[in-house]
Amino acid sequence: MNKCAIILAAGQGTRIKSKLPKVLHKACGKEMVNHVIDAMRNAEIEDVNVIIGKGAELVKERTTSRNVSYSLQAEQLGTGHAVKCAKDFLEGKTGVVAIFTGDAPLIKPETVKNLVDTHINEKNSATLLTSVIENPTGYGRIVRNGESVEKIVEHKDCNEQEIKIQEVNAGMYCFDIESLLTSLEQLSNDNAQGEYYLTDVIEILKKENKKVGAMITDFEETLGVNSRAELAKVESIMRNRINRTHLDNGVTIIDPLNTYIEPEVVIGKDTIIYPGNVIEGKTVIGEDCILYPNSRINNSTIGNGVEIQSSVILDSKIGDETTVGPFAYVRPESNIGEHVRIGDFVEIKKSTIGNNTKVSHLTYIGDAEVGERCNFGCGTVVVNYDGKKKHKTIIGDDSFIGCNTNLVSPVEVKDNTYIAAGSTITKEVPEGSLAIARAKQQNIEGWVERKKLK
């Protein structure tokens, strides 16, 4: 059976009060519409069409990497009108189409798959996704005749019996494509709002004695976002869901309510995460790590047995058994080896640090290639920028860099060298040598007494 999907993403979302189209607001680091697109793909639906309207070009820009097609809804004239705008996408297709909203990022792939499978197995013309809730005020009620759906009744139109129904319409559907296209031609906007409603398709199908079914799911999954408060609620649920998955997989999260982990993060078992950590993007963290409070890690790979304290690591790689922090800053394109010490107030930028090297405190290393088993004294600075462009520094294995050393790039320090504290190095340091580049100390006896006399 051929399957495709339509995602409704044309609205501006006035209640969210933003210049950004509503569906591009992020939940746990990913645009809401991309959460929904990914749910379709993970439910084995590859052919996805996004209905765009307000901010169309920006929505295209933010979703283009997901290889979807687009249909333009120039005027927002209701959900039925939105689907009519996808007529060119649907025509010529056979099979089924799932229709979901781009502002409901909590929908699970397994729910999408179950809805489509239910629709196909029951041979329905339409299948609604529904939820049973304690307080259904404001929601359209699902009126059933046995297992079949008889109609959807809006809250304001309910009679005494219908108002008691707790099963409500989630606004997400699966349709037989041929039945949907035929019904869309019959849609009318003869209502107070002058809009075309997708729910009216259900009424049209029932009049034609077509079979309409429903599948109940957790109401939480169907929550839509119309305001910043609702976005915060949805994101809180998503964070809890993400953290629970890691807990179930053997990760210790000491305070899940105060730990932010984005959905594509991978964490190995027996890793311990303290409160206040922010782990973003496609970060991969190994086993047996300890993340002490208040670090940010973005799009980085962290090895096994790594300890990180109150530090920032961006787009970089940290090797096994390395310690970072407190208050270290590892900037993009850095590659830190195994058993390395990156200490307090150390900044590493676009550099490679070899295994067993120690950079313990108050040091800047930029655009450098550092060998193995090196030691950096406090206050070392790699002077990589000449005011116009950056230059590279190479430091060989087993080198000892004394405190308050300036390495003026481009420069190379060969293997097994020592640099005296306070030196400013501008030339190559040969292998096995000691480099001293500082003014000779001069003591002026009696100077203080003479200074006082003046």
From Swiss-Prot:
Alphabetical GO biological process terms: cell morphogenesis; cell wall organization; lipid A biosynthetic process; peptidoglycan biosynthetic process; regulation of cell shape; UDP-N-acetylglucosamine biosynthetic process
CDD domains: GT2_GlmU_N_bac, LbH_GlmU_C
Main location: cytoplasm
Pathway participation: Nucleotide-sugar biosynthesis; UDP-N-acetyl-alpha-D-glucosamine biosynthesis; N-acetyl-alpha-D-glucosamine 1-phosphate from alpha-D-glucosamine 6-phosphate (route II): step 2/2; Nucleotide-sugar biosynthesis; UDP-N-acetyl-alpha-D-glucosamine biosynthesis; UDP-N-acetyl-alpha-D-glucosamine from N-acetyl-alpha-D-glucosamine 1-phosphate: step 1/1; Bacterial outer membrane biogenesis; LPS lipid A biosynthesis
Binding site for Mg(2+): 103, 226
Localisation per UniProt entry: Cytoplasm
Binding site for UDP-N-acetyl-alpha-D-glucosamine: 8-11, 22, 73, 78-79, 140, 154, 169, 226, 331, 349, 364, 375
Details of cofactor binding: Binds 1 Mg(2+) ion per subunit.
Known cofactor(s): Mg(2+)
Region (N-acetyltransferase), start-end ranges: 250-454
InterPro entries (alphabetical): Bifunctional_GlmU, GlmU-like, GlmU_C_LbH, Hexapep, NTP_transferase_dom, Nucleotide-diphossugar_trans, Trimer_LpxA-like_sf
Region of interest (Linker), residue spans: 229-249
GO annotations of cellular component type: cytoplasm; membrane
Keywords for this protein: Acyltransferase, Cell shape, Cell wall biogenesis/degradation, Cytoplasm, Magnesium, Metal-binding, Multifunctional enzyme, Nucleotidyltransferase, Peptidoglycan synthesis, Repeat, Transferase
Region of interest: Pyrophosphorylase: 1-228
EC annotation from Swiss-Prot or TrEMBL: 2.7.7.23, 2.3.1.157
MF terms (GO), sorted A to Z: glucosamine-1-phosphate N-acetyltransferase activity; magnesium ion binding; UDP-N-acetylglucosamine diphosphorylase activity
Reactions accelerated catalytically: alpha-D-glucosamine 1-phosphate + acetyl-CoA = N-acetyl-alpha-D-glucosamine 1-phosphate + CoA + H(+); N-acetyl-alpha-D-glucosamine 1-phosphate + UTP + H(+) = UDP-N-acetyl-alpha-D-glucosamine + diphosphate
Protein residues bound to acetyl-CoA: 384-385, 421, 438
Pfam families the record matches: Hexapep, NTP_transferase
Protein purpose: Catalyzes the last two sequential reactions in the de novo biosynthetic pathway for UDP-N-acetylglucosamine (UDP-GlcNAc). The C-terminal domain catalyzes the transfer of acetyl group from acetyl coenzyme A to glucosamine-1-phosphate (GlcN-1-P) to produce N-acetylglucosamine-1-phosphate (GlcNAc-1-P), which is converted into UDP-GlcNAc by the transfer of uridine 5-monophosphate (from uridine 5-triphosphate), a reaction catalyzed by the N-terminal domain.
Family: In the N-terminal section; belongs to the N-acetylglucosamine-1-phosphate uridyltransferase family.
Subunit record text: Homotrimer.
Name of the protein described by the UniProt record: Bifunctional protein GlmU
